[in-house]
Swiss-Prot record:
Membrane topology: Multi-pass membrane protein
GO annotation (BP), single: photosynthetic electron transport chain
Gene name for this UniProt entry: petD
An example molecular function term from Gene Ontology annotations: electron transporter, transferring electrons within the cyclic electron transport pathway of photosynthesis activity
Keyword Thylakoid: yes
Family: Belongs to the cytochrome b family. PetD subfamily.
HAMAP family tied to this protein: Cytb6_f_subIV
Protein name as catalogued: Cytochrome b6-f complex subunit 4
Transmembrane segments: 36-56, 95-115, 131-151
Length: 160
């Protein structure tokens, strides 16, 4: 790793550049009018054109019509609701299930306050936040996979 030299603030050339505005906020060209009038509309219109083009060239099929008299044997929610569905399915008391679901965001909101004295960004130097993240990820995967299985195999994932 090289040694970086600190700037000499007594240098008249550097002082003249800083006085002219060439400091930490000098980026080359202003955002007005170049970016806001010319580049942003091109990006926005390009995004709209891509969406319209995909909608015209590859229209999404609606699917089979719904039959209200033929329901599936087991109704499953969308994949992102699997952990919550598994909690409600396995906990016998509905109030306890709702409290467990409320405790998830509450617990996530308390994590920054547990490690607010730690100024590091490296996950290996923040053991509490890293442990909470890994435990929450493993628990969500376990509950999500278990929600796709029958109720008698859902807690053990059919392994035991």
């Amino acid at each position: 790793m090289g040694v970086t030299k600190k700037p000499d603030l007594n240098d008249p050339v550097l002082r003249a550049k800083l006085a002219k505005g060439m400091g930490h906020n000098y980026y080359g060209e202003p955002a007005w009018p170049n970016d806001l009038l010319y580049i942003f509309p091109v990006v926005i219109l390009g995004t709209i054109a891509c969406n319209v083009g995909l909608a015209v060239l590859e229209p999404s099929m609606i699917g089979e019509p719904a039959d209200p008299f033929a329901t599936p044997l087991e109704i499953l929610p969308e994949w992102y609701f699997f952990p919550v569905f598994q909690i409600l399915r396995t906990v016998p008391n509905k109030l306890l299930g709702v409290l467990l679901m409320v405790s998830v965001p509450t617990g996530l909101l308390t994590v920054p306050f547990l490690e607010n004295v730690n100024k590091f960004q490296n996950p290996f130097r923040r053991p509490v936040a890293t442990t909470v993240f890994l435990f929450g990820t493993a628990l969500s995967l376990w509950l999500g996979i278990g929600a796709t299985l029958p109720i008698d195999k859902s807690l053990t994932l059919g392994l035991f």
